[in-house]
Regions:
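Pre-Walker A adenine-sensing motif
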Residues: 1-7
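Conserved, well-folded catalytic cores of nucleic-acid-processing
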Residues: 7, 34-38, 70-78, 95-99, ...
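Walker A/P-loop nucleotide-binding motif
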Residues: 10-30
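Short coil/turn segments at beta-strand junctions that form active-site/ligand-binding loops
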Residues: 12, 40, 104-105
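Walker A/P-loop
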Residues: 25-37, 44
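Conserved catalytic segments around the Walker B and adjacent sensor/switch elements
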Residues: 37-56
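The catalytic "switch" region of P-loop NTPases
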Residues: 53-55, 104-106, 126-185
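Mid-core helix/loop region of P-loop NTP-binding domains shared across ATPases and GTPases
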Residues: 60-123, 131-136, 175-180
């Protein structure tokens, strides 16, 4: 809990990994609720991942343009999203800078992150590196099953720059129903 909160408010890059049923989604819900109840000025961006899959044959992969659109739409509702990649990137940076200067922080949370394509993982590094002067504009929290840990392994040369910047926290599996109920309630 504390690690996720710290990541959200301090511009960190974090992956939360656990087996199905280990409480990952509950932790995400608690984070969003804690930020709201504490009155913290953190805008949480949660791209829709309803039909997300790693490849086209199994569903629709979540790509960098979709993430940029989600950030722009959440941080600056009603703002049009430019179709060209260059203009979209400029608009994204502009809305994050303006929002940051207005006193807000931003946290991108992606559930089912184990289904992210490697190209999208690489693009997340670029999102995370957006700054206004020395101030980082976006925290990133990836939430996924154990396959995400495999993707973020130091043996994955495709995403080594992401691996070097992303902290990975592994949730232990819930062994007893009582443990789960105590965690959940």
């Amino acid at each position: 809990r504390a690690t996720m909160h710290d990541a959200a408010v301090n511009g960190n890059f974090l992956a939360v990994v656990g087996e199905s049923g280990s409480g990952k989604s509950t932790l995400r819900e608690e984070l969003v609720e804690r930020l709201r109840l504490n009155g913290e000025s953190v805008i949480v961006v949660e791209p829709y991942t309803l039909s997300m899959a790693e490849s086209e044959k199994n569903g629709k992969p979540l790509r960098a343009p979709h993430i940029a659109e989600a950030i722009i739409s959440t941080v600056s509702p009603g703002t049009s999203v430019p179709p060209s990649p260059e203009m979209r990137a400029r608009k994204l940076h502009k809305v994050l800078v303006e929002s940051s200067r207005a006193g807000f922080r931003h946290c991108l949370v992606i559930e089912e992150a184990h289904d992210l394509h490697m190209h999208t993982l690489k693009a997340l590094k670029r999102f995370w590196e957006l700054k206004d002067g020395m101030r980082r504009l976006l925290s990133i929290i990836l939430i996924g099953q154990t396959e995400l840990k495999d993707k973020l392994s130091s043996t994955q040369s495709d995403v080594r720059e992401v691996v070097q910047r992303c902290d990975v926290v592994e949730l232990p599996p819930v062994k007893q129903p009582g443990d789960f109920l105590a965690f959940r309630f």
